[in-house]
Amino acid sequence: MNFKILTVDFLSENAPKDFVRSLRGTGFAVIKNHPITKSLLDRVYSDWTDFFNSNKKHDYLFHKENQDGYFPYKSENAKGYNSKDLKEFFHIYPWGRYPDIVGEDTLEFYENIQYLGDELLDWIDYASPKHVSKKFSSTLTSMIEDTDQNLLRVINYPPIKDLNTHGEIRAQEHADI
């Protein structure tokens, strides 16, 4: 098995094949020249750092029935584990609540990441071996088309102040996603 993670140029005509080759070899790929700018990422990161450092986050506690909103520190544990993950996070859905102290950059990022995800799924469709793709019930991109269940999970791993974490770790392996 090849364990070389490829760097794939988003703008290259070979991108779909290179991307799938890297996924098949390692399960990963690095994408360069993608449409998400560093300045946008920096602004989003800054907004959410401010949000997680504020008490306003508690105004957006998650709704149990639809899972949107803020999930406090130690609110989740991985399937099959008893210890809590040492993180807090916020689920953003297209129809969900959105913190008033977070700028519009996150919504732009959400749209861009949706586009990027669609494109990568299209590459997998295009470059997958025929014996694999014929088992798909439909194209991968059509499986997520017009769904309101795509979410953006913004995660914060606060500094650990107490080194005695009682077996808790930053994030257990999650096999339920």
What are the functions of these language-model segments?
Residues 1-177:
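Peripheral, non-catalytic segments flanking oxidoreductase cores
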